[in-house]
């Protein structure tokens, strides 16, 4: 996908209309045009980054800070909201559909239509040595 084809870049350029919730020098938060629940907001960086590995940590942290503030605002706004999911899908296997990093702020309420499933293996606890082995691999990759 080229930058000209990125819908979020086109929103940032003013080519595609949006309903702004929050705007600063690093991020834009706007209403999702295909909300699973009313009040769903997307927070995007103003610099194109197709995935988290292409986004600087400062901007990523700022996105989550803004997402947290928006989540609290949604709760206070009068929109039906008993809880909030903050969701960021990174990569095709994680169901990322638009390859410009974006954070979903999803209002939740009892009986809404959104279902998050962790699969059949959820609840099966691995052995501690397996958890330790994986933790060591991740810890080593952090350095």
Enumerate the language-model features and the residues they cover.
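HIT superfamily nucleotide-processing domains
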Residues: 1-143
